[in-house]
A protein has these predicted regions:
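A structural signal for short, well-ordered beta-strand elements
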Residues: 34, 45, 78, 103, ...
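Non-catalytic, surface-exposed connector residues within folded enzymatic/regulatory domains
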Residues: 18, 35, 79, 104, ...
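Asp-based, Mg2+/Mn2+-dependent phosphohydrolase catalytic module
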Residues: 1-3, 90, 106-107, 111-214
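Conserved phosphate-coupling serine/threonine residues in phosphotransfer and NTP-handling enzymes
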Residues: 12, 103-105
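Residue-level detector of anion-binding/catalytic polar loops
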Residues: 34, 98, 175
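Short linear motifs at secondary-structure transitions and domain/linker junctions
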Residues: 18-19, 28-29, 56, 74-76, ...
Length: 214
């Protein structure tokens, strides 16, 4: 049985990725500019998103680009926890299984949503962009989270939604379950050695926790 669970945040615990995509195109439409395509946006998920940031900077300028991310951070507090992740977190909480978040976002950017959802009652450790030199697909976020939980990577299960995130987890030595969303379901996971994909909270609990107890 795994002794700890490390979650990605955006697109895994809450569906912020679709939310941001819609906000970006709302702002581009407002200024009469061409929308970002879904394929282009999907390439940015789970990592640095430098191409997306550069595109928005060129099209909108720095101030208007930052307004997009400010609106995203302020309105994400209204998004619910993904049902399957809530089930898993509830199980881990009552089973005294430590939980962490390893996110390529800045901790301060996710804090309003983190606080609104009451995630402090579940999550023991949060590792963000400001805590590492390199973000996903580098394994550094996961290695840092594992270290702060004081466990070995092989004792920890990662939950991810993107290729970049899953790559980071695997390269850090963790087993990973990939639960995709509308924005990541068409990514190519064929080179990812995941242990499970698109599983319900109940299935994760039964297969990777309850069954291993027996």
């Amino acid at each position: 049985m795994y002794r700890a669970v490390i979650f990605d945040f955006d697109g895994t615990i809450i569906d912020t990725e679709k939310h941001l995509f819609e906000i970006i195109n709302k702002h581009l439409n407002h200024y009469g500019l061409e929308e970002v395509s879904l394929d282009f946006y999907r390439q940015s998920i789970g990592g640095l998103a430098s191409d997306l940031h550069q595109y928005l900077e060129v099209q909108l300028g720095s101030e208007r680009k930052e307004a997009i991310y400010q609106e995203h951070n302020e309105t994400s507090i209204h998004l619910p926890i993904v049902t399957h992740m809530k089930q898993l977190m509830d199980y881990c909480k009552v089973s005294h299984i430590p939980m962490a978040i390893a996110t390529s976002s800045f901790r301060n950017d996710i804090k309003p949503t983190f606080d609104q959802l009451g995630l402090d009652t579940y999550i023991d450790v949060v590792v963000g962009r400001e805590d590492v030199e390199e973000i996903k697909p580098s394994p550094e976020l996961y290695l840092t989270a594992v270290q702060r939980l004081n466990y070995n990577p092989v004792n920890c299960l990662a939950i991810e939604d993107s290729v970049n995130g899953a790559t980071a987890a695997v390269n850090a030595g963790l087993d990973v379950i990939v639960n995709t969303n509308d924005m990541t379901e068409k990514q190519d996971f064929s080179n990812i050695a995941y242990v499970g994909k698109d599983l319900s909270g109940t299935a994760i609990i039964e297969k990777y926790f309850e069954k291993s107890r027996g």
